[in-house]
């Protein structure tokens, strides 16, 4: 996947970030990893770009019910309603893992496959 570069946008310039995202077609996340255990899958799409210095990622989620019980960062946010983003910057087998709950609690990691 190629990530579009849009230079000159600061992450704290909400209007510019929103305008950039508005010009990007959302891509669906049409994957249910454990359909036998969890047959319900929310509607999820994402948009992404980078500025050269920053990676900007926006998820849009429509979910029937939400859970937000984990209140600390680096807690078990995967047990709540959350989105996950994994990125490998090279072929070393290492990757970054970002998970964010619907209330903004984060789980961050750097792992090897």
Listing of model-derived features with the role each one plays in the protein:
Residues 1-113:
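Structural preference for beta-rich elements and adjacent junctions enriched in aromatics
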């Amino acid at each position: 996947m190629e990530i579009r570069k849009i230079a000159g946008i600061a992450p704290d310039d909400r209007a510019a970030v929103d305008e950039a995202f508005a010009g990007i077609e959302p891509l669906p996340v049409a994957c249910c990893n454990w359909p036998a255990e969890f047959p319900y899958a929310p509607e999820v799409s994402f948009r992404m770009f980078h500025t050269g210095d920053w990676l900007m990622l926006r998820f849009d989620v429509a979910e029937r019910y939400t859970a937000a019980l984990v209140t600390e960062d680096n807690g078990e946010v995967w047990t709540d309603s959350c989105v996950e983003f994994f990125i490998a910057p090279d072929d070393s087998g290492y990757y970054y893992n970002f998970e964010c709950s619907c209330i903004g609690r984060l789980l961050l990691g750097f792992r090897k496959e």
